Structure formats: C-alpha cells, structure tokens
Amino acid sequence: MSHSVKIYDTCIGCTQCVRACPLDVLEMVPWDGNKAGTIASSPRTEDCVGCKRCETACPTDFLSIRVYLGAETTRSMGLAY
C-alpha cells in the first residue's frame, strides 16, 4: 500500500500518535519548534496500513498528523473519483 503520512509543525510533541500506531510507523525526533523539544516523524511509511489511529489520537484541534490513503485503498473503499 502506498499511503503518505504528513506531520505538520503544529505537532506539540505529546507522543500520542506514536503510541497509537499499531505498526510502529512513527517515532519522535528532536525538534526545537515546541516545548517538548520533539516532533513526530514517519520513517517507515511503507508499513502504514491507513488505519488512521494516529489521527484519532492527536489531541490538537488541527490534526498535526494526517494520513493520505493511496489510490488502491480509496478505490477499494469506493472513494475514488
């Protein structure tokens, strides 16, 4: 599956998304853009199954993490145009 995972700079470094991911796609890396000093990173997107648990776990109102499903998945779900 080819999904892309985008981490936005609104990430507060809380680690909720990392803990929610059942496949360890995400990890925290050093970053000086928030108080926590870390930001989520997605080094293993090839393992992402598109469950979007990371999005659900994100406590920010603007979803600092988004999973964009690949064309095969959206087609099989009847979401393709």
Curated annotation (Swiss-Prot):
Domain 4Fe-4S ferredoxin-type: 2-31, 39-68
Residues that hold [4Fe-4S] cluster 1 according to the record: 11, 14, 17, 58
Biological processes, Gene Ontology terms: photosynthetic electron transport in photosystem I
Broad EC category: oxidoreductase
Record EC number: 1.97.1.12
Keywords: 4Fe-4S, Cell inner membrane, Cell membrane, Electron transport, Iron, Iron-sulfur, Membrane, Metal-binding, Oxidoreductase, Photosynthesis, Photosystem I, Repeat, Transport
Reactions this protein catalyses: reduced [plastocyanin] + hnu + oxidized [2Fe-2S]-[ferredoxin] = oxidized [plastocyanin] + reduced [2Fe-2S]-[ferredoxin]
Cofactor(s), names only, from the UniProt record: [4Fe-4S] cluster
GO cellular component annotations of the record: photosystem I; plasma membrane; thylakoid membrane
Membrane topology reported for the UniProt record: Peripheral membrane protein
Pfam families: Fer4_7
Keyword match Coiled coil: no
Keyword hit for Cell membrane: yes
Positions annotated to bind [4Fe-4S] cluster 2: 21, 48, 51, 54
Entry GO MF terms: 4 iron, 4 sulfur cluster binding; electron transfer activity; metal ion binding; oxidoreductase activity
The record's free-text note on cofactor binding: Binds 2 [4Fe-4S] clusters. Cluster 2 is most probably the spectroscopically characterized electron acceptor FA and cluster 1 is most probably FB.
Gene3D superfamilies registered for this protein in UniProt: 3.30.70.20
Location of the protein in the cell: Cell inner membrane
Biological function: Apoprotein for the two 4Fe-4S centers FA and FB of photosystem I (PSI); essential for photochemical activity. FB is the terminal electron acceptor of PSI, donating electrons to ferredoxin. The C-terminus interacts with PsaA/B/D and helps assemble the protein into the PSI complex. Required for binding of PsaD and PsaE to PSI. PSI is a plastocyanin/cytochrome c6-ferredoxin oxidoreductase, converting photonic excitation into a charge separation, which transfers an electron from the donor P700 chlorophyll pair to the spectroscopically characterized acceptors A0, A1, FX, FA and FB in turn.
Subunit: The G.violaceus PSI reaction center is composed of one copy each of PsaA,B,C,D,E,F,L,M and Z, and forms trimeric complexes.
Name the record gives this protein: Photosystem I iron-sulfur center
Protein's organism: Gloeobacter violaceus (strain ATCC 29082 / PCC 7421)
Gene: psaC
